Amino acid sequence: MIKTLVVDDSALMRRAIRDMLESADDIEVIGTAKNGKEAVENTNKLKPEVIVMDVNMPIMDGLAAVKAIMKTTPIPIIMFSSLTKKGSIEALEALRLGAIDFITKPSGLQEISKIENELVTKVRNLYNSNVNIIRLLNLKKFKGEVINGNWNCPDQNLGILIGSSTGGPSSLEQIIPRLPGDLPASVFIVQHMPEGNFCSQLAARLDAISELEVKEAENNEKVKIGVAYIAPGGYHMEIRKALDVTRIKIIKGKPMHAVMPSVDVTVESFVKVYGNNSVAIILTGMGVDGASGFKKINESNGATIACSEDTCVVFGMPKAAIEAGAIDVVKPIFEIPEQIVRMIEVKCNGN
């Protein structure tokens, strides 16, 4: 049984969440808490294996509770987030503090049943995926310098693709800020996120701490060199080239591998545009998204990198790509920025 702690200031919401979780035969709610202070106390006392927690609570809010729990008893935490801009900022802050995932919380109790399947699946996946919280916390401690490159390829069409899921926002903060502002490539980031303001806030955060411009991708916008584009949550991102102009297409299609955006969906078009002038990186995450796509990049003589198991929060996606024979180089996340720059140098300078 997966021992779970439920934290919410509403007694009705706690009961509803408890009922949803315990509808699964492999999940047991071993306790509840009505604020962050009780959550910290019950975590130390009851030793849950997964925590489901709201952000906005009295006495101690969810963000403060995440921070406190990570200091004493780091375990997987799923946060509830609203669809508002404020909610998306809070969700990303929770991820930076050590929470592993979040779920958008319905506005009313009558809507709560709509997230039952997602909630049960996420609790189950976190428990079964060997999530390494210590690695996530260690990511936050490392502060690397910008890696500069030596290149001269003003007319070359170079593309970088990065795929990530669980633990991805913290991993991206170890990569994007260390890429130089004169990088002669366009960067495309596919981070599994739900629809809402989450990816725009992630882009704003990365843009504020990076030399590169980082933005949420918009439909039909022209792709520029030296810009990193993040796929909007809940939509697929494709890259199309016509009459020597490369543009982004944002599509509300069907999920692939149960996710949208999907790395594999983006790769299908990315590899047609960039081919052997591409560098692709698969970071932390559950599942197999990216494995088949990276194989196509590899077969097109593009360069592929996977994050090493010892620096992954969840090794699912990199492991799947490695086992598919789709990866050229496996590197610790702290070495990936330099590896990207060196690979771009080779493709740019023709060495």
From Swiss-Prot:
Gene3D superfamilies of this UniProt entry?
Answer: 3.40.50.2300, Methylesterase CheB, C-terminal domain
User: Which reaction is recorded as catalysed by this protein?
Assistant: [protein]-L-glutamate 5-O-methyl ester + H2O = L-glutamyl-[protein] + methanol + H(+); L-glutaminyl-[protein] + H2O = L-glutamyl-[protein] + NH4(+)
Superkingdom = Archaea
GO biological-process terms attached to the record: chemotaxis
Task: State the post-translational modifications.
Answer: Phosphorylated by CheA. Phosphorylation of the N-terminal regulatory domain activates the methylesterase activity.
**SMART domains from the UniProt entry:** REC (SM00448)
Q: Where is the CheB-type methylesterase domain?
A: 160-347
Q: Which HAMAP family match?
A: CheB_chemtxs
Quoted from the entry, the domain comment is: Contains a C-terminal catalytic domain, and an N-terminal region which modulates catalytic activity.
What is the documented function of this protein? Involved in chemotaxis. Part of a chemotaxis signal transduction system that modulates chemotaxis in response to various stimuli. Catalyzes the demethylation of specific methylglutamate residues introduced into the chemoreceptors (methyl-accepting chemotaxis proteins or MCP) by CheR. Also mediates the irreversible deamidation of specific glutamine residues to glutamic acid.
- Name used for this protein in its record: Protein-glutamate methylesterase/protein-glutamine glutaminase
Question: What organism, scientifically named, is this protein from?
Answer: Methanococcoides burtonii (strain DSM 6242 / NBRC 107633 / OCM 468 / ACE-M)
